[in-house]
Amino acid sequence: KLFDQTIIYKTNEKPTKAINRKTYKNFLEQNLQKKLNNDLQIIGQTRLVTNGSKFSYKNNQPIESENIVGVHNGIFTDLQQYDKKKTQNLESYNIKSDSLTFFENISKYANDQNFISKYVEYLQSIVGNYSVALQVRGENKVIISSNCGSLYYYFEKDFFCFASEKKIGWAPALALTNH
């Protein structure tokens, strides 16, 4: 099975700092090198805090819910009721991000044989802008979706990568195709 395990690395810092950390390099070394000749899925995200405390590990991406691992770029404006002033001032550690709430909500549908239909219905019921990538745990696929038209991708026979920002540097991803 392609996804027999999901390994997560996340940190609360700027991407340029994160990728230069020794812990990140060790993470890649320990987890990627043994997979380069096998199927491999990597989902990454850097988070601009719009709501939910950045100091709460569970709010930082990739997000893990019971049945879903995913990333979200954008903002959902109708998923939570909370004191927006506390969020804007980063005062509340316990406020969940809109992304965490989103993935927890769709996690309920993960084992439904009509998951895609339920997912699309859910997307149509929420307010906000999103580009989302997710994996239902144990499934051999990644689902990507956007309502703001910003999904950029590269595809070859055995390689697919995507981004929600046009300015992504494809060179590191393309280097993986030459293994």
Q: Where are the predicted features?
A:
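Conserved short alpha-helical segments that host acidic/polar catalytic motifs at enzyme active sites
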Residues: 1-179
